[in-house]
């Protein structure tokens, strides 16, 4: 399992998956504390565009998610390499969780990151070959 790796220095970048964005939108204290600590340390915080697609629907119910997005900033660019890495991760993990694979690929392609998630099991499997990606469950 990928999980929290204590034998290496933690990556100084935080990526939020859909579960983390929803938890923040709902005011989850653990998610808020994790985000606050990252911001306090000056760590870049990113929400991949695929997470945006999974968490908004274009109506007034998006307001809490939009507040999280505004606090974090615009999603970073997704490149072809992200798609190719996600495909490899899906194959290695024998998974069909494309959104999760793209989140992990975003971490891999950026040289590593901590990923805050509501779906640890799937992300652990996908991140297993990449010690530079740390998965933190909510």
Predicted regions and their residues:
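Acidic, PIN/NYN-like endoribonuclease modules and their adjacent C-terminal/linker elements
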Residues: 1-9, 110-138
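Histidine- and aromatic-rich ligand-binding microenvironments
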Residues: 16-17, 47-48, 96-97, 130-138
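Alpha-helix capping/helix-boundary segments
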Residues: 20-21, 51, 82, 102-103, ...
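Short beta-strand scaffold positions
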Residues: 47, 77, 98, 117-118
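Phosphate- and divalent-cation-binding pockets in alpha/beta enzyme and binding domains
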Residues: 54, 64, 85, 125-126
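Acidic, metal-associated active-site segment
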Residues: 55, 97-114
């Amino acid at each position: 399992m990928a999980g929290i790796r204590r034998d290496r220095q933690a990556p100084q970048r935080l990526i939020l998956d859909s579960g983390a964005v929803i938890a923040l939108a709902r005011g989850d204290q653990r998610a808020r504390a994790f985000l606050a600590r990252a911001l306090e340390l000056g760590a870049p915080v990113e929400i991949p565009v695929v997470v945006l697609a999974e968490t908004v629907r274009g109506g007034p119910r998006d307001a809490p998610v939009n507040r999280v997005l505004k606090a974090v900033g615009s999603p970073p660019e997704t490149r072809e390499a992200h798609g190719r890495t996600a495909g490899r991760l899906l194959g290695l993990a024998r998974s069909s969780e494309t959104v999760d694979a793209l989140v992990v690929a975003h971490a891999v392609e950026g040289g590593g990151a901590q990923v805050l998630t509501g779906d640890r099991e799937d992300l652990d499997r996908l991140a297993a070959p990449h010690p530079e990606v740390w998965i933190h469950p909510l």
